[in-house]
Design a protein with these regions (language model features):
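Beta1/beta-strand and adjacent pyrophosphate-binding region of the FAD-binding site
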Residues: 2-16, 32
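Short glycine/serine/threonine-rich phosphate/pyrophosphate-binding segments
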Residues: 16-20, 42
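Aromatic pocket-lining residues of Rossmann-like dinucleotide-binding sites
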Residues: 24
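Conserved N-terminal/central alpha/beta ligand/cofactor-binding core
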Residues: 36-101
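A short alpha-helix capping/helix-coil boundary motif
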Residues: 1, 21, 69-72
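Hydrophobic alpha-helical segments, principally membrane-spanning helices and signal/leader peptides
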Residues: 20, 33-35
Length: 101
């Protein structure tokens, strides 16, 4: 039986899994990614078919937050929405730069 070793194991090969894996690797960890299918296949990211909720076309941070809160029907964690609104443009650009879109 083959034994695989890594500092960090990431379960899931969608955008979130790859973001975690790349971030860990950039921090110097030896990383392994495990998914139920090939890279980027069979994931929620794939099923979204590019319909990510991001601040596109110059949408303001406030407008993006309102859109997320509306979609979440008021059940969102406010602090997390604030972080997402502030970070989303740069994180989406990271995914594009890494070829994950």
């Amino acid at each position: 039986m083959e034994t695989l070793r890594a500092d960090v194991w990431v379960i899931g090969s969608g955008a979130a899994g790859f973001m975690a894996a790349i971030t860990a690797r950039l921090a110097g960890a030896d990383v392994a990614v495990v998914g139920k299918s090939g890279p980027g296949k069979g994931t929620s990211t794939t099923f979204a078919v590019g319909a990510f909720a991001g601040p596109w076309d110059g949408q303001t941070e406030a407008a993006y937050k309102e859109r997320v809160l509306t979609a979440g029907r008021g059940l969102n964690e406010g602090g997390m929405v604030d972080i997402a609104a502030a970070e989303a443009p740069d994180r989406f650009q990271d995914l594009i730069d890494w070829g994950l879109t």
